[in-house]
From Swiss-Prot:
Belongs to the HscB family. Disulfide bonds: none annotated. It comes from Chromobacterium violaceum (strain ATCC 12472 / DSM 30191 / JCM 1249 / CCUG 213 / NBRC 12614 / NCIMB 9131 / NCTC 9757 / MK). SMART domains: DnaJ (SM00271). This is Co-chaperone protein HscB homolog.
Amino acid sequence: MNHDFNQDFFSLFGLPRRFAIDAAGLDAAWRAAAAQVHPDRYAASSDADKRSALMLATRVNEGYQTLKSPLNRARYLLQLSGVDTQEENNTRMPADFLMAQMEWRESIDDARADVDALESLSRRLRGEVRDLQTELEAALDARADLDAAAVLVRKLRFMEKLDQEIGDAIESLLD
């Protein structure tokens, strides 16, 4: 059993190194790769081959989770290009984006007791997330503007946190 553990996730699944990917193609490639390296297929193999199969199965699943998520896929593309998104230590954002974040948080706080209002906010937020993903696709695939893409990744991370907050609020009301 000889596999290249250093190949990037796009190569692992036979996909072009782009932000815009064919989700169905990724799913099919993941299923095929996962079946090929499933540890049960190596039950009668040597311990070394079993370990190798387990490591590769883990890598296949990690790759799938990374590429399936637009945020993680964008981070990964930037990482492959040597760009650190600095999400932990660079919280500088354009003033208009910060104002929008404050408005979102106020709207969430105002709607905390109303499932319908929270679900409406969630739909609006998902629309904004789709817009950011479209901007990310343009920055990464069309323009190769890595600095702009890093800022968009930080914005998308903020938006995903808001979506989680809305989801948590809805869940607490339904419990």
